[in-house]
């Protein structure tokens, strides 16, 4: 209403990108590329994010160092360091630094951790004893796909471009399907909307991890504040690369 009234009450808005789409198409936002005093080439702006949302030379929102939300929303992988030690596994920090943290490397850890422990299946039971390799949220596989350097749609030459369907894309999908098997407890999909609770046997992915029943878990930085009370040590690593030939690790954000 304020924008339509033209009263210029607000100069800047902070809102999720998905909430801005309607305002952008309605013409309510100014193209930042037309504002010479907004120096988007300076290092305090996050070019990797901003270039991904710029279309046909127009940019209606931008992220920079002043936006703490993008840090809180960055997705990482948490691991149970105590469980890893009990399994006789080395924490993967050196593997990450050496550029060898790949889906194959992760699979070694998941296979070592997965254990039904006498349960009749890998299906979640609140009083069960199954240990899972990885606790995944309902959108977790997409983050692994992006960690492999793949996207379904990308901005190329200023236009949205469908980038799925390449041989490498399908190779990544195939490998992910083999890594995150659920029948053997290497992975569990925990879709509960309340990440940290177990309602009627329907667990949130954070709950599976914090209850000590998963070696790894999808997580965003903001969740780590609640990890201070855990009764085990934990560590964090980026999403793995597809293979060692991939140049960089990649972790997205909620809006990524």
Model-derived regions: residue spans:
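Early extracytoplasmic/lumenal segment of secretory-pathway proteins
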Residues: 1-17
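Paired acidic/hydrophobic, glycine-rich loop segments that form the ligand-binding mouth/hinge
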Residues: 11-14, 210, 215-219
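Extracytoplasmic/periplasmic solute-binding protein
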Residues: 13, 55-75, 85, 99-161
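Hinge/lid segment of periplasmic solute-binding proteins
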Residues: 15-74, 104
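Short, solvent-exposed loop/beta-turn-alpha elements that line the ligand-binding surface or hinge
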Residues: 33-45, 96-98, 124, 151-171, ...
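Extracytoplasmic/periplasmic substrate-recognition and gating elements
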Residues: 57, 227-256
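A bilobed periplasmic-binding-protein/Venus flytrap-type ligand-binding module shared by bacterial periplasmic
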Residues: 78-81, 254-256
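Glycine-centered hinge/linker elements that transmit conformational signals in sensory
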Residues: 107-110, 142-198
């Amino acid at each position: 209403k304020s924008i339509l009234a033209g009263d210029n009450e607000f100069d800047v808005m902070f809102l999720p990108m998905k909430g801005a789409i309607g305002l952008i198409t309605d013409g309510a936002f100014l193209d930042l590329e037309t504002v010479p005093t907004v120096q988007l080439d300076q290092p305090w702006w996050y070019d990797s994010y901003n270039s991904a949302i710029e279309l046909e030379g127009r940019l209606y929102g931008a992220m920079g160092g002043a936006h703490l939300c993008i840090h809180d929303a960055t997705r990482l992988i948490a691991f149970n360091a105590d469980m890893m030690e009990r399994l006789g596994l080395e924490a993967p920090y050196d593997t990450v630094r050496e550029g060898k943290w790949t889906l194959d490397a992760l699979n070694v850890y998941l296979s070592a951790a997965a254990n039904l422990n006498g349960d009749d299946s890998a299906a979640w039971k609140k009083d069960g004893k199954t240990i899972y390799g990885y606790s995944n949220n309902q959108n977790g596989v997409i983050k692994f796909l992006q960690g492999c350097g793949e996207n379904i749609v990308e901005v190329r030459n200023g236009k949205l471009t469908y980038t799925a369907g390449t041989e490498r894309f399908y190779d990544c999908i195939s490998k992910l399907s083999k890594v995150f098997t659920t029948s053997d407890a290497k992975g569990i999909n925990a879709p509960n909307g309340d990440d940290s609770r177990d309602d009627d046997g329907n667990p949130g992915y954070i709950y599976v991890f914090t209850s000590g029943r998963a070696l790894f878990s999808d997580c965003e930085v903001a969740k780590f504040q609640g990890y201070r009370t855990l009764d085990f040590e934990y560590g964090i690593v980026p999403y793995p690369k597809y293979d060692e030939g991939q140049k960089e690790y990649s972790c997205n954000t909620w809006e990524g």
